[in-house]
Amino acid sequence: MNGRTQNLWFSTFRLVIVYALFFAKLCFGQEECLRGGCYPATGDLLVGRENRITATSTCGLKERTTGVCNNCLHNTKGTNCQLCKDGYYGNALLGTENVCQRCQCPGGSSGNQFSNTCELRDVGKVFCTNCSEGFTGTQCEKCDNGYYGNPLIQGGTCKKCLCNGNINSAS
């Protein structure tokens, strides 16, 4: 390296160092850099800020400047893919592939869906929270009063009774 090349190299190096010290935000100790600021490191989740991208993340593409996810995966939704989509239930914050399961309202072998939302209330018990008109039960598996049919069979539904007030709810 001759004197001129060496001078140019040192000048460039000094410029990079000055730029880094003047413009860059440096985080120290137990902090993590996120969107131009430093925040306490909390492991895989920055609580209230972002679900960090990991190998098992539910976010496929994150907006670099805002940190908002533009491509939620595995039936998730939300700015950080922290919720299950309508029609699915589970804990999306776990970030695994099958964390959000399809609601069974009543679902199963009938394939029928009569609620677009459900939630996990007790261990292993899913409750459908918005049964369509004419359907009732924890899985929308029964016809409501004034309706008849069998929602548990494939293609089954509940139809409004047109019985002029002559209803035998036992049949």
Curated annotation (Swiss-Prot):
Per the UniProt entry, the signal peptide is 1-29
PROSITE patterns in the record, alphabetically?
Answer: EGF_LAM_1 (PS01248), EGF_LAM_2 (PS50027)
| The keyword Glycoprotein belongs to this UniProt entry's keyword annotation | yes
Q: Which residue intervals define the domain Laminin EGF-like in the entry?
A: 66-102, 103-160, 161-171
> Which regions form coiled coils?
none
Cysteine-cysteine disulfides: C59-C69, C72-C81, C84-C100, C103-C118, C105-C128, C131-C140, C143-C158
A GO BP term, please? tissue development
**Pfam assignment, any one:** EGF_laminin
Question: Cellular location of this protein?
Answer: Secreted, Extracellular space, Extracellular matrix, Basement membrane
Glycosylation site residues = N130
Domain of life of the organism in this record?
Eukaryota
- Look up keyword 4Fe-4S and say if it applies: no
The UniProt entry lists the main location of this chain as: secreted
**Recorded GO CC terms:** basement membrane; extracellular region
The family database entries (CDD domains) matched by this protein are listed as:
EGF_Lam
Keywords, ordered alphabetically: Basement membrane, Cell adhesion, Disulfide bond, Extracellular matrix, Glycoprotein, Laminin EGF-like domain, Repeat, Secreted, Signal
InterPro entries for this protein: Laminin/Netrin_ECM, LE_dom, LMN_ATRN_NET-like_EGF
Q: How does it assemble?
A: Laminin is a complex glycoprotein, consisting of three different polypeptide chains (alpha, beta, gamma), which are bound to each other by disulfide bonds into a cross-shaped molecule comprising one long and three short arms with globules at each end.
Q: Which PANTHER family match?
A: LAMININ SUBUNIT ALPHA 5, NETRIN/LAMININ-RELATED
Protein name (record): Laminin subunit beta-1
- Which organism is the protein's source? Hydra vulgaris (Hydra)
